[in-house]
Structure formats: structure tokens, C-alpha cells
Amino acid sequence: MKKLITMTSLLVGFLGNMATAQQSSFPTIGKIHRLDPGLDHLIDTTSKIEILGTGYTWSEGPVWVKKGGYLLFSDVPENVIHKWSAAKGIEEFLRPSGYTGTGTYSEEPGSNGLIINKKGNLVSCEHGDRRIAEMPLDKPEQKKTLAHLFEGKKLNSPNDLVQKSSGDAFSQ
């Protein structure tokens, strides 16, 4: 759990530092625990953990969209992906984000892990539709399924993604 908190703090600290270029007064919380001096080469030693938004049920899968200069993250129970930018703050990016059916699916219908692939598309782990999907950032209607079966059985609940430098993606 400590590693998760450390990684979350790292990401929030890094992105928070990027945000200060546009806006200089976000509330702060906690502190960054530097377990390795190498971190100083990645994150400025004066960086703080800044709160960019509140009121989310369960935030997951943050990914920085370098080309657009914004952050995407999932709110899994609310079935939505939010977008944060220094210019506009928080706005809704995609709803539904993981369950596109009708009726109630579960308490975890939305997307979870997110990455930007080598083509610049958003790839999402979708609990509700039990798949890994890809879509152009500016054309969500072109979302397509990349994987939904393993050995002939539907995926249970894809959770997170990582991508190798070759572009190969792996999920758990």
C-alpha cells in the first residue's frame, strides 16, 4: 500500500508541478517521501502534492496526454473519464467510459487503467463491457474492442495497462 501511495504522490506531485505554470494556487496535501535520491532527477525537490479536483467516488488510471497538455482519469463507479487542464480545470471527457449497456451492471461499471498508445489513441480497461478498447482522443465514437476474450472466455474485469517501448501493451 505504501508503494501505491508513493506512486500516486509521485504522479500528483509531477502533474501538480506542471499545473503551477498556469495556475499558482491549488490546495496542497501531505508530502512526497523520497525513498531514492534518483527521484530528484525526475521531480523538482520543491514540488508539492496539489489537489486538482475533489468529489470523485473512486479515481483510477491517470494518464497524461502530452500532445494536448491535459490529464485523463477514470471515476470507475460513475462510469466516466474526466479531463483536467490548467486552462479549463476539470471537465467531463467521456460518459459512459466502461459500460455501454442498459440497466445496472455492477458497482464498478466504468473504465479503470488508461494509457496513450504509440498511435496517440486512448486505450482503456473497461470493467463494464469486460474489454480493452481503443479510441482516437478526438473521436470517441470510433472506439473499438482490442481484446475481450482469453482462451475463449470473456475477460473478467480488466484493471490496469502498461506499454513497452515497442508499443506492446499488457493488462492485468
PLM features: residue spans?
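Positively charged n-region of N-terminal signal peptides that target proteins for export
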Residues: M1-L4
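Sec/Tat signal peptide C-region and signal peptidase I cleavage site
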Residues: N17-A21
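Bacterial N-terminal signal peptides
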Residues: M7-G16
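Sequence-structural signature of mature extracellular/luminal beta-sheet repeat domains
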Residues: Q22-Q172
